[in-house]
Amino acid sequence: MLEKLINHYSTYSGILAIEFVTLIPIIIGVVYLKHLNASMKFLLIYYTTVFIRDFISNLSAIYKINNHFLYNIFGFVEIVTVGLIYYQAVQNLKIRKWIAILIAISAFLGTFLWSSTEFSSGILTIADLCSMGISILYFNTIISELKIINILKHPLFWVSSGLIIQAAGTFFIFLFAKVVLSENVEYSIFYFYWQVRQVMYILFCLFSTIGFWVTKYDKENYV
């Protein structure tokens, strides 16, 4: 198995690069673990699950097992994890209620759009919409409360910015996943759109890494 895995990574070096990119926020998060609040710990869990998903996905590819269901499952993981990140970050009960409602509605709708053999455009699109909606709601909350001294030293500013960039950048790709990410589409088309998705993910990783790094300033960054 190890030999097959090495050959797989040698053939598809881009896949290995993405897994290394995923490790960057994980490593920085672990380094600054003592500074992480509950929200950032959920983000660390999120990246850990991404790494596990990608590793299992590559193992499945080696043995020619359909791995699309992993990404569909992860759509639910993203909805719940992103929701928990922001639920823990706000104290306003009304905002918490809206976040909980968004999580519940998104997860509920996603169950009707499940597919185990192909990318579910419905689940992945809903996950993007949920991420953008909650991030924008959080931005609106911190702007209205005016409790943060320096926004650039606030971890969730960077996380939210990266999340919005990723979700906005992949929204139409996932919306038309049955066309551009289908097994029946030409490989060049699939590869192009998958690479765009990967670039958006790399940007999110970089923004999140900055978010983990500035956690050391966060406690003294409130009025």
What are these regions, as identified by a protein language model?
Residues 1-223:
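Terminal, non-globular segments
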